[in-house]
Amino acid sequence: MGLCGLLERCWLHHDPDGVLTLNAENTNYAYQVPNFHKCEICLLSFPKESQFQRHMRDHERNDKPHRCDQCPQTFNVEFNLTLHKCTHSGEDPTCPVCNKKFSRVASLKAHIMLHEKEENLICSECGDEFTLQSQLAVHMEEHRQELAGTRQHACKACKKEFETSSELKEHMKTHYKIRVSSTRSYNRNIDRSGFTYSCPHCGKTFQKPSQLTRHIRIHTGERPFKCSECGKAFNQKGALQTHMIKHTGEKPHACAFCPAAFSQKGNLQSHVQRVHSEVKNGPTYNCTECSCVFKSLGSLNTHISKMHMGGPQNSTSSTETAHVLTATLFQTLPLQQTEAQATSASSQPSSQAVSDVIQQLLELSEPAPVESGQSPQPGQQLSITVGINQDILQQALENSGLSSIPAAAHPNDSCHAKTSAPHAQNPDVSSVSNEQTDPTDAEQEKEQESPEKLDKKEKKMIKKKSPFLPGSIREENGVRWHVCPYCAKEFRKPSDLVRHIRIHTHEKPFKCPQCFRAFAVKSTLTAHIKTHTGIKAFKCQYCMKSFSTSGSLKVHIRLHTGVRPFACPHCDKKFRTSGHRKTHIASHFKHTELRKMRHQRKPAKVRVGKTNIPVPDIPLQEPILITDLGLIQPIPKNQFFQSYFNNNFVNEADRPYKCFYCHRAYKKSCHLKQHIRSHTGEKPFKCSQCGRGFVSAGVLKAHIRTHTGLKSFKCLICNGAFTTGGSLRRHMGIHNDLRPYMCPYCQKTFKTSLNCKKHMKTHRYELAQQLQQHQQAASIDDSTVDQQSMQASTQMQVEIESDELPQTAEVVAANPEAMLDLEPQHVVGTEEAGLGQQLADQPLEADEDGFVAPQDPLRGHVDQFEEQSPAQQSFEPAGLPQGFTVTDTYHQQPQFPPVQQLQDSSTLESQALSTSFHQQSLLQAPSSDGMNVTTRLIQESSQEELDLQAQGSQFLEDNEDQSRRSYRCDYCNKGFKKSSHLKQHVRSHTGEKPYKCKLCGRGFVSSGVLKSHEKTHTGVKAFSCSVCNASFTTNGSLTRHMATHMSMKPYKCPFCEEGFRTTVHCKKHMKRHQTVPSAVSATGETEGGDICMEEEEEHSDRNASRKSRPEVITFTEEETAQLAKIRPQESATVSEKVLVQSAAEKDRISELRDKQAELQDEPKHANCCTYCPKSFKKPSDLVRHVRIHTGEKPYKCDECGKSFTVKSTLDCHVKTHTGQKLFSCHVCSNAFSTKGSLKVHMRLHTGAKPFKCPHCELRFRTSGRRKTHMQFHYKPDPKKARKPMTRSSSEGLQPVNLLNSSSTDPNVFIMNNSVLTGQFDQNLLQPGLVGQAILPASVSAGGDLTVSLTDGSLATLEGIQLQLAANLVGPNVQISGIDAASINNITLQIDPSILQQTLQQGNLLAQQLTGEPGLAPQNSSLQTSDSTVPASVVIQPISGLSLQPTVTSANLTIGPLSEQDSVLTTNSSGTQDLTQVMTSQGLVSPSGGPHEITLTINNSSLSQVLAQAAGPTATSSSGSPQEITLTISELNTTSGSLPSTTPMSPSAISTQNLVMSSSGVGGDASVTLTLADTQGMLSGGLDTVTLNITSQGQQFPALLTDPSLSGQGGAGSPQVILVSHTPQSASAACEEIAYQVAGVSGNLAPGNQPEKEGRAHQCLECDRAFSSAAVLMHHSKEVHGRERIHGCPVCRKAFKRATHLKEHMQTHQAGPSLSSQKPRVFKCDTCEKAFAKPSQLERHSRIHTGERPFHCTLCEKAFNQKSALQVHMKKHTGERPYKCAYCVMGFTQKSNMKLHMKRAHSYAGALQESAGHPEQDGEELSRTLHLEEVVQEAAGEWQALTHVF
């Protein structure tokens, strides 16, 4: 504590220890006190020598050398003292440096700060700054010791000495367990009198300029330190550094005792104090791995699992600080320490000053005096005598005489609020407050306190606070907690307490200069001011919407992300903002507070005016709205709000924002703000064009449209245009004769409510006369004044003073008979009309309690109350007919709705009066004597209550569904089961109609009504009456019409048994039976409240047609809670036990857990599933579980054939066939066949819905309903038609259909056994044209095919697809085995880039391609054929094959070329390839031959090559056909590697293997190759198949004889296999669209083979390379037993066929997969599903037929797929071929192994990495097929070769 602070207190206060207080005249401090020790420096006197000596030592330690002789300030620099002395001059304040004069001393003080020199003393050695010379001297001594030599560092705790400071620090850690502190030691009482840097805003002084700079940022809001990662700004560099740790994840502060690490040093200190400090009381649990100590075993287990389980080091979370605070809150200090601290606190001279401040605070904070014997209300605001804009702390300081401190709180201070125990357990706060307010009360309380409380109080230390802190301070374990004087909250920082106190005082010192709003915290004001500037600097990255503050942006972003961080503590709902949650939480307490009557009130006092009432003050009703359902009268807004708030229907928690001009309250502050403008006349939203002001932005937007001249709302009748929808709606009244608004006084009708209201003002004089008559009658009889005024409360201006109700709900619950003694005046407004709202104008005796018991004690009291109720008066004339039923839904209601009152009373009375109401009665079956409350409400009705039967069903519905109808309307108290229903109902009160019709502008309350209305515009009347053929637009209109044809009259009058078709007619009739006073019947109020019932009953009638189930008996919340506590006896029935179980599970919620998290939490058992990571205790459980994976259902029902996985399910199912229902419900006597069905049914009675949707707040009775509901959350988007895509070097282009394929040619005829044949022009199809388009084509009379490729048809095309329609078939074409509907087109694709180049080079396609003479192609790369050379391609389609193949990125190019006319193409290596182009001049087929594609090649050179390759046996036509396998690798080409004559563009090429058989050389030297896999080619599996023959050596190499190959010497003709290999140079590839065969010279040495050859034939298992694919296949079979030799280079997956590999490779490429582009021509006859392959269709068909052709030989199980059988067989063999590469686990399926590796070893990341970086050689690859060798094997060995590929 500084000297100046001591002097300040000494001069301002009287200290009882002897320090005298100076009077005002003692200005020069020259006073004399005898026998006192006087200080010569400060002239203070002390009675004792010890005090004087201590005081002098303070001078020596804290004084600066230069002292002011007129005040206690001292200075280190003499110049600063000179400047200071000029402030004491009494004359004009003048600066001694610049001689500038000032009018005020304060201005001079601020000015001389510019001239002051640095006061701090700087160390010349290290530059450290010090305030006092003594501090500098101590510091310099350290430097001298360092220079002198070694220094001994002594431990202050144990006096040990160490040579280095690091050793001392290590040693001090041993004392940390005892002397650790979680907070820094601050000097709470800083002497700021000597600080020279003053804040210009608040006057606070600081020692350093840097401190002042940081402080000023609090006032200016400047945040210069911005985060580079997220843009967040801070006002201090240290805060930014702390924030950056969140991004970096750095935790530099490591605990020395355990592995924990922290980002902040304070968290580390708190951690050390919490887990490493000594625990004095109670058991402790020590960690075996580190030195952590815990008080509970659970904390130790949590610590071990986090820190010592080998996982990542989980440092203590950010919430650990909060746990530290909670843990240390009630830890006690040693008694000696407490006493010592208390003694030191009392010895301080400032204790009296502190007590004065606390006294002032408590006086200011005392609530207003309340009546004796009553405690202040919980919600009552504290009456504070401070000004509205002043801080209570500031006022207390001023009253106590201390210097004031700034009240502005630091906006950036974090509030470490800490809620302590309640006052009963925390005597600290109460003791302080009692001591200060009333000592006598405090003594009495101390006498009554128990010894335990006294012990607790002794263990805790209470210190009085400093002058700056209100309330008390509780210090615990070195932490000072500042207790709020109003509540039990505690804070570490005084500034946090100051801000918190404003919550209680409602002080908002920070006012907005531009509007009326004020705020408690300056940061909130700063954010608010940004809304006035119009600057919206924060933009949403999703929708680009801008916001003025970052907080608003954060809340908005939650709309996009769906984050709802604020959860309700009472239910499962979550909210985006805390304000929404706060509003929602109030709804939980709203009804309970109303029921419990927490806000007690006195009986209502009604003050009625004595003199004439002015006409404008007469309240008018709202116009009656005429609808199809009846007459509806809306609530008058002024009467509703007045009654609503005066009668306390709304609690403060629900509508916290109240208008201080009127009684209205709102849920949101923005609504209040807009409402207040109606009082103040403020219109802040100005139109920039005309200057008009508006109260809201929405009205301004609508107004701006009037300036634009845009009239977007048009009348459909007269074409008139209007600016707004309201103008159009008003205009539409001209075109119709509807007059829906009726005056409630004279029944005159109007088109608009505005005109009706104008008319209704003419009735005010009549109403005023009636009111005067009513007042005169009221003054005659004083005994009935209260009751009459209650009836007129909604028709006149009254003032209701509410204080308290006679009894609370708790008292009523304890003594239900008290409800019977209520006087009528206590039940505010329970007139007959109010009951009529809910009970359809029944007499008051028709109350709910008639359902309880015939001998109800309440009936007499109700009858007595009815006799006391006078005849109702009304301001309306008697002209309103009886037939009108007017809804007056609110202003006639009592304080509590009458039905609600009677429901509460009936429940309480029935519980109290029924002798059978006990725990066991709820379980007993219903009987005449003992039955539960719910059953009695249903079953007991007698002839005495016949008048209630009409409303019984409605009454039951309200009673039974009360627990489920939790959403209540604030206007009429009607209950709903869903919030959406309530929302729609509220619109009937507010008049909101958000759903607008686009055609006529009418608004509707729901989208369903709008949809029905829109049908009226279409004129379509789809609903016809089957009796009279009348048509209606909606189903509801038809339903109402059908009632006219029905002779049934289901609605019976309970008085005369007359029947009616509708409830409306029945209720109108029932009114005739009612005996009510004439005055009551004369008013329109008797019918008031009827429409709500009519609407509700009609709605229930409509729902009755949908639900045929009878009414369900439902237990109330109290009954269910009582049932849950019951333990049923052993003799109880199954139904009774199930009822108790269902009641107990009502609050249980079964949520869907994350599967992976659930598997991790579950314990591991010995019986593990081989398909998934689950494990089970019993082998039988595992067997049942495995059936989920295998799909096995061994238990089959003999009755219906249904199969089940478990036998118990079959047993339950069989009971449904027998009809036995052994389980009966004792509540409603319904019977069920299984116990599970009974359990589900019992939830209807208890209302239990344990199954909660994880995506919303809905709950369901069964998991199946939840599952069905969850499907709505995953509803897929409507499937879009997939557009055909083409992979090419450019983008995928959409085809344009230019051909009408639906037309047919009369010359086409279809025969069953014929083959498609025809003549095609060889020049029609050009080499190198690959793409996609549909071109028109036709067939001439001679059978020639003509395709017209004109410039006009190609001008707008990017991709061209050649499509041959059905009408293109010539007269000699025959079709067999093909559906005529499937031959609409034959697709050949042309690459768009090639087409473009072709058009540019030779204008090839500009002419008509036809077979007419005189037309020849002009392309130099294409040669005309010799017509004398026969050439043909014979195509025989397989059975059921559709000739509609879409060959993706390829085409089949055919053309006749002789040997002399061959096209020469030159590659980069200098070799010339002879392109052999084969022709397609006819489609012929031998009858009965296999379905295959035969290529007859007439080129002599190719024939010779094939003949030599085939060997001598090949010429024999009688031998077996030889097969040639053409393997085309997937290679890439670039434009640079293509020959100059080839117009090809780069494209991705796929792989295809063709198995062809050679039947020998024909007589014309031609060789025929037959392609067996026609389906693979025609379904789009081919890209480009090239057969090249080099010009150098036109011979195939000799047959390779490998002794290792099996089957070579076998019988049968040898077969020729042409094996491909990768070319040495990628540029040698010529991507021609033709069948080419490339041979390699037979003299090719093995050393000259390409280096990539090994990779092309490399074993996937052992990485061994082979020279050919055949050798590799043989090796894979013999060594590894596998046939999958085609491996993916990316993911190493293996396939049997190259086509499968090709399809798989598409998964590694971007864009649609190849399989998705294949045409799905094979359709299922049952479900119309289509497939690309017949095998897929065959497998699919087994689903419908139930065929299971694959049988297990060991257990006779059958499966519909071979793969399922293979998986099943592994169960018998126990084989687990797929081993995990990281652990020893094995799996039967590779997918399970991958799943295991992803979960257990995080293999997914590595897999993605490898997939994202496939190995590339860096060279461009070619797809040209180089046939390297011919391998001869026996034909039998290669029979399965076609299946492999």
Swiss-Prot record:
Stretch list, region Disordered: 404-466, 864-890, 1267-1297
Amino acid composition bias (Basic and acidic residues), ranges on this chain: 443-458
Biased composition (Polar residues): 427-437, 1286-1297
GO biological process, one term: cellular response to glucose stimulus
Subcellular compartments: Nucleus
Tissue expression: Ubiquitous. Expression levels are highest in skeletal muscle and brain, intermediate in heart, pancreas, and placenta, and lowest in kidney, liver, and lung.
Coiled coil: none
Signal sequence coordinates: none
Keywords: DNA-binding, Metal-binding, Nucleus, Repeat, Transcription, Transcription regulation, Zinc, Zinc-finger
Zinc finger residue extent: C2H2-type: 37-59, 66-88, 93-115, 121-143, 153-175, 197-219, 225-247, 253-276, 285-308, 482-504, 510-532, 538-560, 566-588, 657-679, 685-707, 713-735, 741-763, 967-989, 995-1017, 1023-1045, 1051-1073, 1167-1189, 1195-1217, 1223-1245, 1251-1273, 1657-1680, 1686-1708, 1722-1744, 1750-1772, 1778-1801
Main location group: nucleus
Gene Ontology CC annotations of this record: nucleus
Record GO terms (molecular function): DNA-binding transcription factor activity, RNA polymerase II-specific; RNA polymerase II cis-regulatory region sequence-specific DNA binding; zinc ion binding
Source species, domain of life: Eukaryota
UniProt xrefs under PROSITE patterns: ZINC_FINGER_C2H2_1, ZINC_FINGER_C2H2_2
InterPro entries membership: Transcr_Reg_ZincFinger, Znf_C2H2_sf, Znf_C2H2_type
Protein task: May be involved in transcriptional regulation.
Similarity remark: Belongs to the krueppel C2H2-type zinc-finger protein family.
Full protein name: Zinc finger protein 236
Organism field: Homo sapiens
